[in-house]
């Protein structure tokens, strides 16, 4: 658990091998409620953008924290990459916590954040059938609703504390007024958006990134439109090292 994201460069991994690799680490997540799947592999999410399907998640986020069980890891394979742009950044939630002022660590202890899929409607554009549509999102909302998670949590394997904040899905901090909650959310987002706690990856076709989804946020930079970009992602729900 020394590294929160690792990379494999220039592979020719097939969808079947991608899925098998992910299964070695734990249970695979169900098909994504909004994004399409790779043909013949419903557990592999197809993230495809071009001039007709612009990028739709141009924000920092941790995957699927609105679900009851927050996924353990994501494994992303680059299938087609634009000549310019399309990088992905990761932010360490360990480092974000470590860099908090001592008083802020004390203030955040015991606070809880509401992670809600409904806020996702503000981060996507509905321009084609391949982009998340309003109908598909609305269909997913009753199934997932929201989850309440501590703002400061501890990794189940390492025990290290981390800042459990997800800019894309956290809609409110429990126990605070709306103004207090909004101010704290902005402060936390700015605190985590620092180069000192980030890594940036310039993709080549065949590259693989695997990251610990519990202690990172990531940002797919949407600077390549209208060029074509295609990525495949498998999400691992449960870490085999952690008892159910």
Residue spans of the language-model regions?
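Non-heme Fe(II) oxygenase catalytic core, chiefly the N-lobe of the double-stranded beta-helix
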Residues: 1-208, 213-244
């Amino acid at each position: 658990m020394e590294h929160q994201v690792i990379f494999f460069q220039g592979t020719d991994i097939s969808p079947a091998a991608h899925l098998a690799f992910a299964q070695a680490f734990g249970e695979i997540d169900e098909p994504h409620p909004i994004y399409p799947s790779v043909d013949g592999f419903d557990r592999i999410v197809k993230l495809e953008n071009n001039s007709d399907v612009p990028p739709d998640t141009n924000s920092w986020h941790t995957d699927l924290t609105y679900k009851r069980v927050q996924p353990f890891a994501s494994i992303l394979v680059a299938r087609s990459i634009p000549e310019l742009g399309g990088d992905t950044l990761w932010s360490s939630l360990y480092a974000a916590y470590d860099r908090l002022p001592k008083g802020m660590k004390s203030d955040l202890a015991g606070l809880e954040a509401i992670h809600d899929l409904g806020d996702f409607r503000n981060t996507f554009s509905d321009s084609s059938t391949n982009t998340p549509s309003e109908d598909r999102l609305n269909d997913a909302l009753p199934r997932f609703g929201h989850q309440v998670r501590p703002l400061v949590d501890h990794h189940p394997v390492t025990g290290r504390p981390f800042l459990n904040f997800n800019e894309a899905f956290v809609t409110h901090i429990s126990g605070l007024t709306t103004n207090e909650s909004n101010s704290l959310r902005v402060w936390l987002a700015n605190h985590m958006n620092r180069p000192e706690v980030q890594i940036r990856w310039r993709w080549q076709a065949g590259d693989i990134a695997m990251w610990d989804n519990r202690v990172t946020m990531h940002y797919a930079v949407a600077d390549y439109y209208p060029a074509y970009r295609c990525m495949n992602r498998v999400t691992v729900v449960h870490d085999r090292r952690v008892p159910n």
